[in-house]
């Protein structure tokens, strides 16, 4: 039986999120191919990092997905780098636990600049597209609230008004065949692409939420690695 949330009635978000690379289609990776995977750990669960790392190594040895029964889909964890410290936590089979540091989202600086581009690394699975800037800020805030309530201090994150223009550079729709036990859905509809935004009129609070978006993403289905993006100035 799922454990209850600390606040509210919805099931709590996962404390560990794996954000895999998204290729937009099913592909077969040749032997020896290397890919990078982002892992985000929230709250006190950072203390379980070594168990998580050993679990990833064990998964690699046994394989993942149906093809593991045929000795397929096996992988090796070559190295792990902490993005906050910039140092390796795992390198050449050696573990450097002191290289692992954390950051509180409260310490993130508001996003600077007047114009930005948002590139979706993984599909955004919200109810509709295109979005306006108010939608973006609202979706980031909602996701952040879930994590702060469950793994943070639970402090209030007030709504923010956002005025600005958004231009869709390119957008691609994807049908993702992934099973959700919570919602009993067989598939998700998602979008990837790039969005230009004029943020010159945004408040400091709204700019801070955009900085948070680079960490926690936006929209629903965070457990599936959905809605993660990169934001850069232009």
What are these regions (language model features)?
Residues 1-234:
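RNA-interacting cores
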């Amino acid at each position: 039986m799922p454990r209850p949330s600390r606040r509210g009635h919805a099931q709590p978000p996962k404390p560990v999120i794996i954000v895999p690379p998204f290729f937009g289609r099913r592909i077969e990776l040749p032997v020896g191919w290397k890919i990078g995977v982002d892992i985000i750990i929230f709250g006190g669960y950072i203390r379980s990092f070594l168990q998580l790392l050993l679990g990833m190594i064990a998964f690699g040895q046994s394989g993942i997905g149906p093809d593991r029964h045929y000795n397929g889909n096996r992988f090796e964890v070559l190295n792990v780098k902490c993005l906050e410290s910039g140092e390796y936590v795992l390198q050449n089979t050696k573990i450097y636990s002191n290289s692992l540091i954390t950051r509180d989202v409260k310490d993130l600086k508001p996003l600077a600049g007047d114009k930005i581009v948002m590139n979706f690394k993984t599909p955004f699975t919200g109810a509709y597209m295109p979005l306006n800037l108010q939608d973006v800020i609202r979706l980031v805030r909602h996701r952040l609230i879930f994590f702060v309530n469950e793994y943070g201090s639970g402090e209030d994150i007030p709504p923010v008004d956002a005025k600005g223009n958004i231009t869709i550079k390119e957008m691609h729709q994807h049908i993702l065949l992934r099973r959700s036990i919570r919602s009993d859905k067989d598939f998700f509809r998602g979008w990837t692409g790039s969005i230009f935004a004029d943020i010159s009129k945004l408040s400091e609070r709204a700019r801070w939420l955009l900085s948070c978006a680079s960490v926690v993403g936006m929209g629903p289905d965070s457990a599936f690695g959905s809605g993660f993006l990169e934001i850069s100035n232009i």
